[in-house]
C-alpha cells in the first residue's frame, strides 16, 4: 500500500476484530468444530447466484481444486488468457497439463471466443476465463464454443466480485468458478482465502472431498454412524480448508459488498470521465448489459498523442509523486 491520503486497503473495523476474538475464545476454530465456514459457504453461494460453494485457504488452490475436479492432467491442454496473474497459468502446469495462451481483445483485455478458437487442438480440455480487473468476459459465445467442442469452463473471478454479465453474476455461468480473498482483493478473509462455486452437485462433492483429505460429505453427514465414529476417507485429497477466523471476516465483508461495489463504481466512473477529456488517454466502454467490478480502473495511453518528453511511465511517476496510487500492467 502506498503512503497516500487515500483510505487504506484492506479495510477492517472493530466488527471484524470482535468477531475474530469471539471465534478464538470459543475454541471452535476449524471447519470440524465451528459453523462460520459452513455459513460463509452458503451465503457466498447465494450471493454469487450458484447452488454450491467450497471455502478454501486461498485463491490459488481454488484454481487447483477446480482443475482436479475436472480431471485435468498430463496430456491435456487448457486455454488461458495471455493477460492474467501467474496463478491462472501455474495451476495448469501444476496439474501436469499444458497452458495454451489465447490473445486478448483491445478493450476488455480478456480473451474471446474468436481468440480461443484460434488455438484449440484435439488435446484441449478446458478454458480458464479471467474476468480481468472486473470486466466480464463475453461468456455466451465462449460457452457456445465450449459446448461445441465438449470443453469445461472455469471462471477465474479473483478480480471480479460483484461483476455481472448480461444480468448474471460472474461465476454462475461456467462449470466452476474460482474466487480469491487475498488482502488486495475486493473483499478479503483476513489476508488470504478462496472459494469455488458451482451449480453441479457432483463437482461440488468432488471439490469438497479433495480439500479435506478425501472425506466425503455424504459419508460424514448423510449416513448413520455408530458411537465413536470419526472419519471415513473414500478417496485421497489434501488439506485446503479455510479457517473459522477467515470465514467470520468473510461473512462480515460479504454483507458490505453492495455498498463497496457502488463506491468502487462511483470512484472509477469519476476517473474514467476525467480521462476521457484528455486526448492522450483512451477509456474503453463496457457493454451496456454488463456491470464492472472495478477492481482495477484501466486507462490506456495513446503514445502518439503525448507531448514531447512524456511517456506512460512519466505519467505514472507524476501521479505517484502526488500521492495517487497508480501502476502499469
What are these model-derived regions, one by one?
Residues 120, 143-152, 195-215, 310, ...:
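Basic phosphate/pyrophosphate-binding loop/patch that engages nucleotide-derived ligands
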Residues 160-166, 173-296:
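Active-site region of PLP-dependent enzymes
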Residues 284-329:
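Conserved PLP-binding catalytic core of the aspartate aminotransferase-like
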Residues 90-92, 145, 169, 186, ...:
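Hydrophobic/aromatic ligand-binding patch that stacks against planar heteroaromatic rings
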Residues 68-157, 164:
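PLP-dependent aminotransferase-like
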Amino acid at each position: 500500500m502506498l503512503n497516500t491520503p487515500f483510505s487504506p486497503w484492506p479495510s477492517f473495523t472493530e466488527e471484524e476484530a470482535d468477531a475474530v476474538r469471539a471465534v478464538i475464545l470459543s475454541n471452535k476454530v476449524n471447519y470440524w468444530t465451528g459453523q462460520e465456514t459452513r455459513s460463509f459457504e452458503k451465503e457466498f453461494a447465494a450471493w454469487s447466484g450458484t447452488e454450491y460453494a467450497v471455502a478454501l485457504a486461498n485463491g490459488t488452490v481454488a484454481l487447483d481444486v477446480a482443475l482436479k475436479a475436472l480431471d485435468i492432467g498430463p496430456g491435456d491442454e487448457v486455454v488461458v488468457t495471455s493477460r492474467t496473474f501467474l496463478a491462472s497459468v501455474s495451476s495448469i502446469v501444476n496439474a501436469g497439463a499444458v497452458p495454451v495462451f489465447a490473445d486478448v481483445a483491445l478493450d476488455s483485455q480478456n480473451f474471446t471466443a474468436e481468440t480461443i478458437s484460434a488455438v484449440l487442438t484435439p488435446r484441449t480440455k478446458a478454458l480458464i476465463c479471467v474476468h480481468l480487473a472486473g470486466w466480464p468476459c463475453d461468456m455466451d459465445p465462449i460457452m457456445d464454443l465450449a459446448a461445441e467442442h465438449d470443453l469445461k469452463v472455469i471462471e477465474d473471478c479473483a478480480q471480479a466480485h460483484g461483476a455481472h454479465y448480461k444480468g448474471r453474476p460472474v461465476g454462475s455461468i461456467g462449470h466452476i468458478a474460482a474466487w480469491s480473498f487475498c488482502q488486495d482483493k475486493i473483499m478479503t478473509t483476513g489476508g488470504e482465502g478462496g472459494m469455488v462455486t458451482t451449480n453441479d452437485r457432483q463437482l461440488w462433492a468432488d471439490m469438497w472431498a479433495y480439500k479435506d483429505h478425501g472425506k466425503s460429505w455424504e459419508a460424514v453427514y448423510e449416513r448413520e454412524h455408530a458411537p465413536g465414529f470419526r472419519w471415513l476417507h473414500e478417496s485421497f485429497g489434501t488439506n485446503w480448508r479455510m479457517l473459522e477466523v477467515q470465514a467470520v471476516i468473510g461473512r462480515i465483508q460479504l454483507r458490505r459488498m453492495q455498498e463497496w461495489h457502488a463506491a468502487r463504481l462511483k470512484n472509477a466512473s469519476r476517473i474514467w470521465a476525467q480521462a476521457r477529456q484528455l486526448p492522450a488517454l483512451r477509456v474503453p466502454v463496457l457493454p451496456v448489459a454488463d456491470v464492472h467490478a472495478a477492481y482495477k480502473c484501466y486507462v490506456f495511453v495513446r503514445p502518439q498523442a503525448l507531448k514531447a518528453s512524456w511517456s506512460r511511465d512519466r505519467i505514472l511517476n507524476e501521479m505517484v509523486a502526488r500521492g495517487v496510487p497508480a501502476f502499469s500492467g
